[in-house]
Amino acid sequence: MIYHDLAEYYDDLVKDEEATLRWADLTEDVLNRPGCSILELACGSAEISCELARRGYKLMATDLSEDMLNKAKAKNGAETLRFMPLDMTSFDLNETFDAVLCYCDSINYLPDLEAVKSMFHSVRKHLNEKGVLIFDMHTPDRLEEFSEEFIEEGLIDDVPYQWTIMTHDDQIHHHFAFWKDGLMLQEFHVQRAFNLNDILSMLHAEGFETEVLVDFNQDQNSPGEKYFVIAKL
């Protein structure tokens, strides 16, 4: 299970308050419905869910990793959130939402297009009339960025770590290593890049109309790291 040992160090590795605010701002700009209901998939440590809850939205925050959910539940601002462990490729919550979010390139953790298709189908069943799905995913530029090995090293609470990232074909491989109490803890993550047209075709087949931005607010054809896909019923 990924995000097990890593959950303890996740925020120290990737927390970006400015980016969290930009994700929340984008969500508000798209929804334009204060106080509406939102389901977040792959919420991680729930930074974005907590920020949206502070802005008055009703959040259910879900993730496959219960270790990450436990990390999220302990945060200030998490008191008003509902949490649930959930596999985003297939779920049935017996309720619907005004919006579903899947941020931080979480969709790139899915193993293939069939899993993505299954996710979109599950999302469609959980959206209210005129509901919205918003997610981001890697662009081809992101693959190119790690065509040469990237290594980050440092200390988190006196625990040495190393994070290695490298592109292999259409995948980005992450290797995390932590040296704690004389032991090395490791996690290996694989993210897969998907063709944007394939993704849009599957969304259209589910009845969504789509808009694509790059890096929050640029045109679809602009260079950048992330596609932001806005899919509306």
Which sequence ranges carry the predicted segments?
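Conserved class I S-adenosyl-L-methionine
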Residues: M1-G44
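A short glycine-rich, Lys/Arg-flanked "PGG" loop and its adjoining helix->strand segment in the class I
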Residues: K117-E129
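Class I SAM-dependent methyltransferase SAM/SAH-binding core
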Residues: A46-S90
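C-terminal lobe and adjacent flexible extensions of AdoMet/dcAdoMet transferase-like proteins
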Residues: D198-L233
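A short SAM/SAH-binding and catalytic strip from SAM-dependent methyltransferases
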Residues: D98-E114
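SAM-dependent methyltransferase
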Residues: I134-M202
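A short acidic, Gly/Pro-enriched loop at the edge of an enzyme's catalytic core
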Residues: T89-A99
